[in-house]
UniProtKB/Swiss-Prot annotation:
GO terms for biological process: actin cytoskeleton organization; actin filament bundle assembly; eisosome assembly; endosomal transport; establishment or maintenance of actin cytoskeleton polarity; protein localization to plasma membrane; regulation of cell growth; TOR signaling. Residues 33-147, 157-176, 626-669 are annotated as: Disordered. Signal peptide: none annotated. The modification Phosphoserine is found at residues 145, 150, 153. One of its GO terms (molecular function) is identical protein binding. GO terms for cellular component: cytoplasm; mitochondrion; plasma membrane. It is a peripheral membrane protein. Residues 296-381 form a coiled coil. This is Phosphatidylinositol 4,5-bisphosphate-binding protein SLM1. Keywords: Cell membrane, Coiled coil, Lipid metabolism, Membrane, Phosphoprotein, Sphingolipid metabolism.
Length: 686
């Protein structure tokens, strides 16, 4: 019962596996119909690979199963192999099974055998048709028919692949005496000679390339020397090579900083050194390639000819009788197996002991011949490896030298050109040359030299009291011959009375007339009219300045001046009287210092609030103070030289004067008049 149960379970497993395989086959067939003919080959190959995997799995399952029922007769004429020697044998195996074997899409899954699974091409397989009365058989027959030609072809190809794989595995078994792992009919010397001939061609190509490189390096030397000669700056110095000789070049050279200061004058030296260094490096590279690298490669190429001849001379070492010895070993193996079979099943014709001794002796002889051949291969391969190692190392050494030379040339660009320019001319400010040129050349101003102002100027006797103006303003002077008056701007200084056309001391610098006070006196002035208003004009605003006789030609003359007010006239009269009557210079200094409120050094004193300055301040660079004719106030505000008052042009007034009143000396006094607004003067009636 247990045996039947085991067999039933095995059959059920096979049936389930068969159904899965049939379903998979059906899906594959549908997929194949839907694909184009171009994709059929690829899909078929993938299906075969999947079928092989499924075939191996099912073989494992079938080999573990044992069938006792059913009728499947297979006459197998199998030629078995014992230790690699084919032994003809005939065996009839009868398998009883009530189920047919399953054929999947890849072919026959496997043949169940109780013996060796190896089946050669002489194996005849007969598959019995299932019993028609068997329902299960009918069902399986409907699902998977053996009449399908594609399935049968796949089965045959699968069996052939299995057989070839097993044979290759046996042939590569190092324990089998019927296998020779060493090639017996090979020609390794010819192959190796051809390989080193190819290496000779490679070396020749490298030699041609390096020869052209050497030629190019020679051309680089010529081109770099041309570039070195093209560096021509006639007014720049080149270190250790060139100095300007002409006076013009030397003068132009002074426009730039000297050599070594990072200026543009360093450029010729850097470029010249760069091109000369490249020319020297290219010349060195050409010499090294021509005299060292290329000759070594040529010697190696000539040596390879000798080595190739030596390799070809070793061809006799590979002549062997391994195939002959292998046949004798097979014959001895066959005799040994037959003697052993006869000793087991029938009357022995030969003693297995003796046949085994003969077999072992033949195997040793075969191995000796095989080892001789093996040593020849080892010797050839070792020598070839060493020779090729030398070839490769020489080529590597040559290309390494070439790469080093190129690297040195590339490094020169950085070391001599880029680094020097980067640390020098590239790194300076664009105005570096200009600033140094301006600072060194005496024909230009320093960039940081400020402009001077007039108030910063100091010179000797700058604040001498004799340089100040005492009073200035508009007066009217009567003509010598006519009774008319002409208006002018008068400036009273310690020594002169000057008449100007205008009050602008920037444009009008030359006086129309100048009267020396040392040659003049003030004689009289008009009396103040008590009945007139404070602002009245006329006979009460006149004074006479008498010019003394100077020699025979020049006679004395009375100059009649008219002011716009009595107070202004008295101020002019008093100042003129003191200045004309004072002959001592010290007294004159004292008067000026007190009147203009000057310090001991001659500078005007500041007021208490430090906001206003005496209007009689120094007149620097021949400029004078500007003051209205009404303004005689000592403490009035100072008017700078840059301010030009807007005054009227010369005004002529027709005024007649019959007589001048006597001068009242008691009315002369130093006073500080007020500032008045100038108004038109009415006609004076005598």
């Amino acid at each position: 019962m247990s045996k039947n149960n085991t067999m039933t379970s095995a059959v059920s497993d096979m049936l389930s596996q068969q159904q899965l395989n049939l379903q998979h086959l059906h899906n594959l067939q549908q997929h194949t119909r839907s694909m184009t003919s171009a994709d059929h080959a690829n899909v078929l190959q993938q299906q075969q690979q999947q079928q092989q995997q499924q075939q191996q799995q099912q073989q494992q399952q079938q080999q573990s199963a044992s069938f006792q029922n059913g009728s499947l007769t297979s006459d197998i004429n199998q030629q078995s192999y014992l230790n690699g020697q084919p032994v003809p044998s005939t065996s009839n195996s009868t398998f009883q099974n009530n189920r047919t074997l399953t054929m999947n899409s890849g072919g026959l899954q496997g043949i169940i055998s109780n013996g060796s699974p190896n089946i050669d091409s002489n194996t005849n397989v007969t598959i019995a048709v299932p019993d028609p009365n068997n329902n299960n058989g009918k069902q399986l027959q409907g699902k998977n028919s053996l009449t399908n030609t594609s399935i049968l072809s796949r089965a045959r190809s699968s069996l052939q692949r299995q057989r070839l794989a097993q044979q290759q595995q046996q042939q590569q078994d190092p324990r089998s005496p019927l296998v020779i792992l060493v090639p017996t009919a090979a020609q390794p010397t010819d192959i190796l000679a051809a390989r080193f001939s190819a290496w000779r061609n490679v070396i020749k190509s490298v030699i041609v390339y390096l020869t052209e490189i050497a030629s190019i390096q020679d051309e680089i030397v010529r081109q770099q020397l041309r570039l070195s000669h093209a560096v021509q700056f006639p007014f720049f110095s080149i270190e250790n090579q060139y100095q300007p000789s002409s006076q013009e070049d030397k003068s132009v050279q002074k426009f730039f900083l000297p050599l070594g200061n990072g200026s543009i004058q360093d450029l010729p030296t850097i470029l010249n050194q760069y091109h000369e260094s490249l020319a020297s490096s290219a010349s060195k590279a050409s010499r090294e390639l021509t005299n060292d690298v290329i000759p070594r490669l040529e010697d190696l190429r000539r040596d390879l000819i000798v080595k190739i001849k030596e390799i070809k001379s070793l061809q006799s070492d590979f002549k062997n009788s391994c195939s002959k010895e292998l046949q004798q070993t097979k014959q001895a193996m066959k005799q040994f197996q037959e003697s052993l079979k006869d000793a087991r099943y029938s009357v022995p014709k030969q003693d297995p002991f003796l046949t085994k001794l003969a077999l072992d002796r033949q195997i040793k002889k075969q191995l000796q011949e095989e080892n001789f051949l093996h040593e020849a291969f080892d010797n050839l391969e070792t020598s070839g490896a060493e020779l090729e190692k030398i070839v490769v190392m020489e080529i590597q050494n040559s290309l390494t030298i070439y790469a080093r030379l190129l690297g040195q040339e590339a490094q020169l660009v950085f070391d001599i050109l880029i680094s020097k320019l980067d640390s020098g001319f590239f790194n300076v400010d664009p105005q570096f040359e200009w600033d140094n040129f301006i600072s060194r050349d005496p024909n230009f101003l320093l960039p940081n030299l400020p402009m001077r102002t007039f108030k910063e100027i100091v010179y000797k006797y700058q604040f001498d009291p004799l340089t100040y103006e005492i009073k200035s303003g508009f007066l009217e002077r009567r003509s010598k011959f006519l009774k008319s008056y002409s208006k002018g701007y008068y400036v009273l200084t310690p020594n002169f009375l000057h008449e100007f056309k205008t009050a602008d001391r920037k444009k009008d610098l030359v006086p129309v007339m100048s009267l020396a006070l040392s040659e003049c006196t003030v004689t009289e002035h008009s009396r103040k009219n008590s009945t007139s208003s404070p602002n009245s004009t006329g006979s009460d605003a006149k004074f006479v300045l008498h010019a003394k006789q100077n020699g025979i030609i020049r006679r004395g003359h009375n100059w009649v001046f008219k002011a716009d007010s009595y107070e202004s006239m008295m101020s002019w009269f008093d100042n003129l009287k003191i200045l004309t009557s004072t002959s001592n210079i010290q007294d004159k200094y004292k008067f000026i210092t007190q009147k203009l409120n000057l310090n001991s050094d001659g500078k005007p004193k500041l007021t208490n609030n430090h906001t206003s300055i005496n209007k009689y301040q120094l007149s620097n660079a021949n400029s004078t103070m500007v003051e209205n004719d009404e303004n005689d106030d000592i403490n009035s505000n100072y008017v700078g030289s840059t301010v030009t008052p807007k005054l009227d042009n010369q005004t002529n007034t027709n005024t007649s004067m019959s007589s001048l009143p006597d001068t009242n000396d008691s009315e002369l006094q130093d006073q500080v008049p007020n500032i008045y607004i100038q108004t038109p003067i009415n006609d004076f009636k005598s």
